[in-house]
């Protein structure tokens, strides 16, 4: 036999005016806070990830791509030398 936990049913919660008054403010506020966190660049500083313009050195603006599988080791060594 099923008992009751004493909690309000979910259908009562989402149909209440109080729920929508609270959430009509908090949901957009969280969205705006997240947007500001990312758009101001604070997310890069907090998590320590490089900004999009600093992934590569100034001289190298392309992805270091290995094109020949038989000379892969030589190409990787060349890429690493360019970083120094």
Swiss-Prot record:
Residue ranges that the UniProt entry lists as topological domain Cytoplasmic: 2-18
InterPro entries: PSII_cyt_b559_asu (IPR006217), PSII_cyt_b559_asu_sf (IPR037025), PSII_cyt_b559_CS (IPR006216), PSII_cyt_b559_N (IPR013081), PSII_cytb559_asu_lum (IPR013082)
Positions bound to heme: 23
One Gene Ontology cellular component annotation held by this UniProt entry: plasma membrane-derived thylakoid membrane
Compartments in which it is found: Cellular thylakoid membrane
Lumenal compartment residues: 40-84
PROSITE patterns noted in UniProt: CYTOCHROME_B559 (PS00537)
GO MF annotation list: electron transfer activity; heme binding; iron ion binding
Keyword Heme annotated: yes
Signal peptide from the UniProt entry: none
Entry keyword set: Electron transport, Heme, Iron, Membrane, Metal-binding, Photosynthesis, Photosystem II, Thylakoid, Transmembrane, Transmembrane helix, Transport
Lipid bilayer topology: Single-pass membrane protein
TM helices/strands, residue ranges: 19-39
Cofactor remark from the record: With its partner (PsbF) binds heme. PSII binds additional chlorophylls, carotenoids and specific lipids.
Record bears the keyword Signal: no
Highest taxon listed in the record's lineage: Bacteria
Cofactor(s) the protein needs: heme b
Function: This b-type cytochrome is tightly associated with the reaction center of photosystem II (PSII). PSII is a light-driven water:plastoquinone oxidoreductase that uses light energy to abstract electrons from H(2)O, generating O(2) and a proton gradient subsequently used for ATP formation. It consists of a core antenna complex that captures photons, and an electron transfer chain that converts photonic excitation into a charge separation.
Family per similarity comment: Belongs to the PsbE/PsbF family.
Subunit relationships: Heterodimer of an alpha subunit and a beta subunit. PSII is composed of 1 copy each of membrane proteins PsbA, PsbB, PsbC, PsbD, PsbE, PsbF, PsbH, PsbI, PsbJ, PsbK, PsbL, PsbM, PsbT, PsbX, PsbY, PsbZ, Psb30/Ycf12, peripheral proteins PsbO, CyanoQ (PsbQ), PsbU, PsbV and a large number of cofactors. It forms dimeric complexes. Part of a photosystem II (PSII) assembly intermediate complex PSII-I; crystallized from a strain deleted of psbJ, it forms monomeric PSII before addition of the oxygen evolving complex. PSII-I includes 3 assembly factors not found in mature PSII (Psb27, Psb28 and Psb34).
Protein name per the record: Cytochrome b559 subunit alpha
Species assigned in the record: Thermosynechococcus vestitus (strain NIES-2133 / IAM M-273 / BP-1)
